[in-house]
Amino acid sequence: MSPLECSECFGDQLLHKTYTWHLTLHSRPNFTRKRDTRSESLEIPVNVILPQRGTEPFLRLHNLYSTPRCSRQAALPRMSRRVASQHSYPLNRFSSMPFDPMERPTSQADLELDYNPPRVQLSDEMFVFQDGRWVNESCRLQPPYFSPPSSFHHKLHHRRLAKEYQLQEENKSLRDENRALRDENKALRKENKILQVFWEEHKVTLGHEESQTSSLLHKDTTSQEVVKRDNTTLPAQRSKESTLQLIREENRALQQLLEQRQAYWAQAEENAASTEEGKSTSSPKEESHNSGLLPDQSTNHSSPFEDPKVPPTTQEDSKTLRALREMVNNLSGASGEEDGKVGPNLPDSAQPLQLLREMNQALQALQEENRLLQEENRALHILREEHRVFQEENKALWENNKLKLQQRLVIDTVTEVTARMEMLIEELYAFMPAKNNKDPKKPSRV
């Protein structure tokens, strides 16, 4: 049973399209001998089978006709050794291979047809067309060796159908799994969207709570910071106020001391002048009589600072001195405390002297600073004068440059005008007629 009539594999009677072409091989004449100019031809049918179900096309060369098709073919003699063609490469290279390497072509002997393979004699050898290629007749294989059994084609096709069926089943199962996975993916996306909405709502509520707690914490922290600042600024403000108050009291005390000293020194000078006048007028007798009273007077007038007429001034001086020393001790550190300890041990007569010395030192320092400031002020005045002088010089130079530029412009315009006038005069004299062949005198330049 041939594959063209197989109903078990394909289910139809006509499942292949068969196309047949006839190849005609013409042999050239052999010109080695002058008399032999004959040419012979050989006709070979080519059968091409195109299957319709899943198989691939392949080419077969067969001699489908046991008898010659026409009288001309029957009349053709066999190719002899003498007229054989020298060129055998078309026959040696011409082969028939199936397009599918898994399928072996079915020979015409397997199809149980009458089969006479074509033969060609080239040179001394005979070639037979067997299984799609030209084979030497001496090396020709027997049909049981090279031809597959008749059931090979059916088994191969059944295997292919089984593989295709398995692949289709696998594709169906994979499609079902893909659909199930898509459905699960859709459900998970919906759940994800719902969870995102819930999370945003929860986030908003958490943000409100955090803002409330943060506002409360911020208020608490601000109140604590304000309290801390107050606590830190209060002693600083108190210390500043105390120092300012001490400085004010010190200034007032210094002013009072200066006023008292001025009045005291003026009164002392008057007393000294009156005593000198009294001494000059008094006689030596009176001095001898009053010698007993001199020690008392000397004791009473031992220091110029002890004036019996002005007892409250000394008390005020001592009070102010003590206040000043206390302020100095408060402002200065341990050195001031040591001075305060030593100060009260001094006698009352030395306290105003020490105060005057300190005031004198302060005044000298202030005078030195004032002198330095005056020198700086003088230097600044000198610099201002120099700057003013430089400005005046720059202004004068700028005016001078401006005048020079104007002068240059005027000179350039005058030269240009004179040049044009000369050109015009020359043109006028050129147009004027000559008189007695005398050259006209050119006018002088303006």
UniProtKB/Swiss-Prot annotation:
Sections of the chain in a coiled coil: 161-197, 236-264, 353-411
Compositional bias (Basic and acidic residues)? 208-231, 276-289
Q: In which tissues is it expressed?
A: Testis-specific. Expression is restricted to the flower-like structure in spermatids.
Name the InterPro entries on file. Answer: Chibby_fam
Question: Which positions bear Phosphoserine?
Answer: S41, S85, S88, S96, S123, S147, S211, S223, S274, S332, S335
| Pfam annotation, one family | Chibby
| Positions of region (Disordered) | 208-243, 268-317
Q: Which keywords does this Swiss-Prot/TrEMBL entry list?
A: Coiled coil, Phosphoprotein
Q: Which CDD domains does its entry note?
A: Cby_like
Keyword Transcription regulation part of the UniProt annotation: no
A single GO CC term for this protein reads: cytoplasmic vesicle
The record's family statement is: Belongs to the chibby family. SPERT subfamily.
**What is the protein's quaternary organization?**
Homodimer. Binds to NEK1.
What protein is this chain from? Protein chibby homolog 2
List the source organism. Answer: Mus musculus
